[in-house]
Amino acid sequence: MIKGNSFPKTSRLLVNSQFRTVMAKRLSARDELLVLYACESGLDYPRIGISIGKSCGNAVIRNRLKRLLREAFRQNKHLVTPGFDFVVSMSPQWVRQTRGRKDAKTVVGAIKLAQIRDSFLKLAAQLTSGRA
């Protein structure tokens, strides 16, 4: 395994208070796929928290989305400005489009890692430009 590509616990937001701190800062950006919240952490590496609500679908769908988000962050954390904590969730627009569809698994299966990666990196760059 490549050492720089790991995803240790220190790279994750783990407890509710960490999520609340990021959300309280109200620094956010969204696109058609993701909503990203950010705040400065003072650490020399970025951290991520993933929040996928039940409105996104059943457990299979939610777990697939979380795996894609974690993998996109893990592979690209070197491209993200260090010193920021991020909380990422699915865009309400995307949730509305997929909710109640019989083919929701197919829709989620069609989301590619590259789409998640591009969306995350674009939003992270918007939030961290001119900071840190």
Where are these regions (language model features)?
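Positively charged, solvent-exposed patches that mediate nucleic-acid binding
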Residues: M1-A132
